[in-house]
């Protein structure tokens, strides 16, 4: 993995830029994310004895997930941003530990389940990153934003906002995300769309748009995602 590219992609998380734009590190979305994780695990009857999250942020996802797993399950979170690590340390316990580090600090074959949630789009050399993640555990669960749609291309401010406010370096469709995983050596076991945008409406305009998205999605899910966006991709891989 290119060390210069890695350093460039990590800079916003180390110099406080990301913290300034996202002061709670998206912790408020954690219960929703955990519900999507559990949906996938239950679909495949996966009951991990050990879980690692790469890019664990403020640590709330692992804390929320822990209460839904066997009490003996060991959970570890790795995060490169010191600000987030300090927040996550407050959430640690006997079976839940957080570390200041990245994918290179996780031992190969060290867990049953690796979580990589809303991380891939932030990594400059994302293909090198995916190759590193591949051998860390048995199952890998990715959550990837689908930023490219007809709407986002027509509204040029949409992708620019993803870059400047959310620090997305790469933009995906469902097909390009799945292809990237397959081309870096993964076997895709299952995937589904997640309503990561439509479930959160903080203005009446967004509520109207998201209601329309939900209606269209119920009829033509793939077409809705390609045209209107508003959904992300949850992928289980080996």
Give the label of every model feature segment.
Residues 132-136, 143:
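Conserved helix-to-beta-strand junction in the class I
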Residues 176-192:
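A SAM-dependent methyltransferase catalytic signature shared across enzymes that methylate proteins
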Residues 21, 143-168:
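Short, glycine-/aromatic-enriched active-site segment of Class I SAM-dependent methyltransferases
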Residues 1-110, 117, 127-132, 166, ...:
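Conserved N-terminal segment of class I S-adenosyl-L-methionine
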Residues 124, 150-151, 199:
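Glycine/Thr-rich phosphate-binding loops of Rossmann-like dinucleotide-binding domains
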Residues 115-122:
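Short catalytic micro-motifs in class I SAM-dependent methyltransferases
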Residues 123-124, 137:
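Helix-to-beta-strand junctions that scaffold the AdoMet/dcAdoMet cofactor pocket
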Residues 187-188, 222-226:
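Short proline/glycine-enriched turn/loop segments at secondary-structure junctions
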């Amino acid at each position: 993995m290119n060390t210069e590219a890695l350093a460039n992609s990590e800079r916003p998380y180390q110099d406080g830029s990301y913290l300034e734009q996202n002061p709670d590190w998206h912790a408020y979305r954690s219960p929703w994310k955990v519900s999507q994780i559990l949906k996938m695990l239950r679909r495949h009857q996966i009951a991990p004895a050990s879980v690692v999250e790469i890019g664990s942020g403020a640590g709330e996802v692992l804390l929320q997930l822990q209460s839904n797993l066997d009490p003996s399950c060991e959970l570890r979170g790795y995060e490169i941003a010191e600000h987030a690590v300090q927040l996550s340390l407050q959430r640690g316990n006997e079976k839940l530990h957080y570390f200041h580090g990245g994918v290179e600090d996780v031992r190969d074959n060290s867990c049953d389940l690796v979580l990589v949630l809303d991380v891939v789009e932030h990594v400059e050399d994302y293909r090198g990153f995916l190759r590193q993640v591949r051998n860390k555990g048995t199952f890998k669960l990715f959550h990837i934003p689908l930023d490219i749609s007809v709407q986002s291309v027509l509204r040029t401010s949409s992708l620019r906002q993803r870059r400047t406010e959310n620090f997305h370096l790469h933009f995906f469709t469902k097909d390009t995300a799945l292809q990237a995983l397959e081309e870096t050596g993964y076997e895709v076991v299952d995937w589904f769309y997640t309503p990561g945008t439509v479930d959160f409406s903080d203005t009446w305009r967004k509520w109207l748009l998201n209601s329309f998205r939900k209606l269209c999605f119920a009829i033509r899910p793939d077409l809705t995602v390609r045209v209107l966006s508003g959904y992300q991709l949850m992928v289980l891989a080996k």
